Amino acid sequence: MELHQLKSVSKSRNHKSKVVGRGHGSGLGKTSSRGQKGQKARKSGLTRLGFEGGQTPLYRRLPKYGVANKGILKKRWVVLNLNKVAKLNLKTVTRATLIEKKVISKKNNLPLKLIGNTKLTTPIHFEVQKISKNALNAVQTSKGSVKIIT
């Protein structure tokens, strides 16, 4: 059997859809297959998703969780690790030099924070907004300097 030999089963294509609510003679007049009275018989009778007949629905009985704006007030930083900075072989580390070396994006306006406790072999001058105690000790032991920018 092939596709062009297929035929429809008898009476399967004879079903015509009827327009409801157009008089008794149409077959679906008066109540338009909605039954007699009640909420579902009315024009706006369909209930919303989760409706439980006036009872407090489940989505309102359960507690809220997962606040959407949790980190919106949190201070964010671009964290620089001494390991990565030492591999760049720079004498001074500023936002401009980091953008030039493509360590951070030009669009990134977040303040810089220096962390880590790697021993530096050469003295490096840093210009950052914040620095950890360990990173400050590591920079000072290598005879480098740190300028805190506000």
From Swiss-Prot:
Look up keyword Nuclease and say if it applies.
Answer: no
Taking the record's annotation, the residue ranges forming a coiled coil are: none
**What SUPFAM superfamilies does its record include?**
Ribosomal proteins L15p and L18e
Q: Name one GO cellular component term.
A: cytosolic large ribosomal subunit
Q: Name one Pfam family in it.
A: Ribosomal_L27A
Which residue stretches belong to region Disordered? 1-49
Gene3D superfamilies noted in UniProt? 3.100.10.10
What keywords tag this UniProt record?
Ribonucleoprotein, Ribosomal protein, RNA-binding, rRNA-binding
Q: Where does the record place Basic residues bias?
A: 10-21
Gene Ontology molecular-function annotations = rRNA binding; structural constituent of ribosome
Task performed by this protein: Binds to the 23S rRNA.
The UniProt entry, under HAMAP family, shows:
Ribosomal_uL15 (MF_01341)
> Which PANTHER family does the UniProt record give?
50S RIBOSOMAL PROTEIN L15, LARGE RIBOSOMAL SUBUNIT PROTEIN UL15M
Quaternary structure and interacting proteins, as annotated: Part of the 50S ribosomal subunit.
| Family assignment from sequence similarity | Belongs to the universal ribosomal protein uL15 family.
The protein depicted here goes by the name: Large ribosomal subunit protein uL15
Recorded source organism is Mycoplasma genitalium (strain ATCC 33530 / DSM 19775 / NCTC 10195 / G37)
